[in-house]
Amino acid sequence: MKKNKKKMCAWLITMALGLAIVGCSNAKMTTTTETTIQQSKTTATNTSSITTVGEYSDEDLDTSYSDSDTKIELSTGSANITGDGATFEDGNIKITKAGTYVLSGDFDGQIITEVGDEDVVHLVFNGINITNTTSSAINAATGKKVVITLVDGTTNTLSDGTSYEYADGEDEPDATLFVKNNLTINGNGSLNIDSNFAAAIKSKDNLIILGGNIYIDSVDKAIKGKDSVTIENANITINAEDDGITTDGALVINSGNINIEKAGEGLEAITIDINGGNIDIVATDDGLNARGLLDDSASDEEKEAYGEENQADTYLKITGGVVNVDAGADGIDSNGQVYIEGGTVYISGATSGPDVALDYNGEATITSGTFVSTGVQEMSQTFSSNSTQNFITAYYSSALEAGTEIKVTDKSGNVVVSYTAAKSFSFAVISSDKLTAGETYTVTAGDNSSEVTIAAGGNTIGESTGGGPGGMGAPDGNGGPGGNPPTGEPPQKPTDANGNELEMPEPPSSNSSQTEKN
């Protein structure tokens, strides 16, 4: 993420105003769970109203196979094929017809599809271990859709080498499990992917995961669906050097367990909808990143201006589930909006500016749910004034160490909300539907204890000691203060992670267009 210039633009605006700134386990998974998705030509649902990319087709939901389907029994460098539509050629399995193929056994080579544009290929993984040292394990470069079913009780493994051999002018496949078009994964079995060259799972259209226990270890991205990613009823564990789950479109998580033990950015998409599930993210960069797209031909100035814009169609929305983020940069970073409408969200952001726990270009509102974020004061933001659920913005004069519990108790000593921060912090945003206007609460963090009588909207304890934009507080003055107190003195210049002052550029003025790129 391009952070420094983004933050420096905010500093320049501040100087012009001359006032306070206002907010600008490594063990592979074998647990099985039961898939319960209704086949009704409508969206599978665990709640009364959820957001999804589209309808699930019968093919997406089909986990069935029979004795009449083609069987492919793999045996290291050979295969025994019973049925039509598949051949063993040049050390690989080639599938040439639409249909269902049941695969089992160990294999050194590649599964290739060469089917028609409208064909659907159903691959049933019934205990496979496929390794290809010179390319991807699965190369579905043709067909309308590939559906992979993980048979209950089986463990299936895909792995590749550290380099791929390509024909002249080619650069695909570029993932251990590569699908040129649409990909659906369903079933209750396990899938382990050891990705040593590029991404682990990649679909260049829509990617749907409706079940399974998936473990990914990748030197690059873990899961990429170019147009969209939808996840339900799956258990996914990720260790990735690059992004955990990413798409150039919409990411929707309706249920399941997602454990991103390591990634650059945890979840990344144009729009992110989290409607349920348990999501744990440890990221070296942003935890949750809702961002737009630029054409590759855009200039640096256009890209910088684009990053500063409120991208109206870009958002992060959480309506349910439990989300826990430990981020090396921004915990939440939205180039547009942030909507917290339910669920439980815990965010631990960076320990030094300009990265913060909550970062947005448009607005951030909370209307329901539980939310706690901790981070630094520099460039910090809190919720916008049009939030309908009460919240507290807390400033601390010195950093509190990692492992410090921040909690809110009512006048009877009952804990309303608590969170143990993964990193040191000097700033926190706390919200709960149990924070009642007119009631007095105690906010405790380490040796710090403050009482606050809740007013509708935003409430503040402590004073800011860092430069940069504060949050959009309530209009009655109870909201988070912006940057330094308005003493007439200019705010501190933004610094890099080492505390060095950053050079001030001229603010960009160019506009840019939002278009897809591969």
Description of each model-found segment:
Residues 1-7:
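Positively charged n-region of N-terminal signal peptides that target proteins for export
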